[in-house]
């Protein structure tokens, strides 16, 4: 009964969704494009019979990069279709994989749209990153006997409490899933408490630890650092949200009194906020360039606004230390491990609930510095820039946490083998 009500409500609110897409399209025109894909209509052919992977956020897409590359290496004859929900996620997939994968939007959770989609790609296996539990998608896959794996699965106490209110509906939903590969024991226990069977849940660890700085990326970062700031200190503030850019800029202005040649790389989380961040820098009276301009910072450039997609790992490689945003405002923070992979100190605000386990491990190992405002941010950045030993201490411990917790990728790949043809590599 609840399933029918859910589906009926979803059909009823479609006009509101169209209005929302149109309104969002004012700032981000890509939201007004490719509406057909959201209902299972595609203008180009898609190769069927492969692996489908869905990631809703940019962070999930980044975590999926090593997994997709490993699957392509092991099963080169199987097409991989990566689905997202937003233009930002779409851009990230295209910049990460190019033509190596097929990319489309996942249709809304409407039975007819999903049937058109599944008829088109007819996957052998479906992977959903983290916790995107779409009832009609799960039901359609179950009906077609297509294995469904929730990879890198996580479930916060708050989300679990919300799902628990739905009782049997959620239990039925979970038992239609083939395998839940949980990030840690707590996540696994929450899925079981909601109704998943013990043999459905396996703890694999977090895929977010299985990132690495390739030799090619490291070489590119060294070259860019020589071009941009061969004799200047550099710090980076990434994935910033509304309210954080002003804090970062205030800290940078304070730091310039002590380090007149200090360069800040400022990377807002969402592309539609690039113009807003640029305006804040301009209002602060700071000399700036944008990454998209292709210009090289001059000796007088004080800020580079990172307004391109898919370059975050490269930009981390230029910096001496990093502040990771979404953490000074209540957004739960973003992934600190991308900075840690470069063995640089990581600073975050107190709001890190999206990465609670990862941040706890970094904090316990002296790989994370917590700040609360512009003053403490400026103070810690100053200390790190002044003392190379202090800076190296935090950078070394951060990357050690990364290395010590790797292995989730290999464990997940082994779990997927029964659902795929024999690997060729």
Where does each model-flagged region fall?
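Nucleotide-activated sugar donor-binding and catalytic core shared by glycosyltransferases
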Residues: 1-425
